[in-house]
Curated annotation (Swiss-Prot):
Pfam family, one: PDE6_gamma
Organism of provenance: Canis lupus familiaris
Protein name: Retinal rod rhodopsin-sensitive cGMP 3',5'-cyclic phosphodiesterase subunit gamma
Any one of the GO BP annotations: positive regulation of G protein-coupled receptor signaling pathway
Acetylation recorded as keyword: yes
UniProt cross-references to Gene3D superfamilies, sorted A to Z: Retinal cGMP phosphodiesterase, gamma subunit
InterPro entries noted in UniProt: PDE6_gamma, PDE6_gamma_sf
Record-stated family: Belongs to the rod/cone cGMP-PDE gamma subunit family.
Lineage: Eukaryota, Metazoa, Chordata, Craniata, Vertebrata
EC number: 3.1.4.35
Subunit structure: Oligomer composed of two catalytic chains (alpha and beta), an inhibitory chain (gamma) and the delta chain.
Residues with N-acetylmethionine modification: M1
Region of interest (Disordered), ranges: 1-55
Record field: catalytic activity: 3',5'-cyclic GMP + H2O = GMP + H(+)
Task performed by this protein: Participates in processes of transmission and amplification of the visual signal. cGMP-PDEs are the effector molecules in G-protein-mediated phototransduction in vertebrate rods and cones.
């Protein structure tokens, strides 16, 4: 006497038997560009040429280099500075 229940045959709904075998395609591959291209122009510096307006800095001239980007781009948010690679 056999007490085991009959085994149900499990079939895959997506597999077709007897059809042509094609290799499966993976996810699409994206190529990363070497240079970043922005849709808009990068922001301009806010205050330029204020060397003679500051007391005690008359001899430096108006062509001073700002080291900290927050001084030249103080009208922008940090995420905008990061978007254009300034910081």
């Amino acid at each position: 006497m056999n007490l085991e229940p009959p085994k149900a045959e499990i079939r895959s709904a997506t597999r077709v038997i007897g059809g042509p075998v094609t290799p499966r395609k993976g996810p699409p591959k994206f190529k990363q560009r070497q240079t970043r291209q922005f849709k808009s122009k990068p922001p301009k510096k806010g205050v330029q040429g204020f060397g003679d307006d500051i007391p005690g800095m008359e001899g430096l001239g108006t062509d001073i280099t700002v080291i900290c980007p927050w001084e030249a781009f103080n009208h922008l948010e940090l995420h905008e500075l990061a978007q254009y690679g300034i910081i």
